[in-house]
């Protein structure tokens, strides 16, 4: 997989946003939490991930490049809030009351669990399977497990084993 280059101006905008919200949090909480590490290695349809123990935020470079400022404004505080909640409260529900409080009361941003960015460019190819009652789209990972004989999947409605039909033209 080739690494996408994130323009320096976009990286600076990410860091400016991160520092703004971290400063807000440190002032509000009376803490001196360090700056988390940021990298651009998140894959798939997730916009970002917070790695709690390593105090690191991973951002999806494709979604960042496609959405720029709206991505920064939404995803950076969202992931930072996860890190801050972990430092402040230890292990709690990922989008629980502590996280909502951190987002809304401390960082002063809406607490949204999921992004609404277009993901067609990062969605993985799927494979069509069928049972008695409907068609199912399996990811490449699940499809490969079926091919290797490591897994079989059944329909939740009828209970029948899924049978491979075709590759989706995504």
From Swiss-Prot:
Chief localization: cytoplasm
Active site annotation, chain numbering: 79
Essential cofactor(s): Zn(2+)
UniProt: Zn(2+) binding residues: 78, 82
Pfam families: SprT-like, Zn_ribbon_SprT
Family of this protein: Belongs to the SprT family.
Domain annotation SprT-like: ranges: 22-165
Domain of life: Bacteria
Gene3D superfamilies, per the entry: Metalloproteases ('zincins'), catalytic domain
Protein name from the UniProt record: Protein SprT
Gene designation per UniProt: sprT
GO molecular function: zinc ion binding
HAMAP family, per database record: SprT
Listed PANTHER family: PROTEIN SPRT
Cell compartments where the protein resides: Cytoplasm
PROSITE patterns hit by this protein: ZINC_PROTEASE
Leader peptide range in chain numbering: none
GO cellular component: cytoplasm
Keywords: Cytoplasm, Metal-binding, Zinc
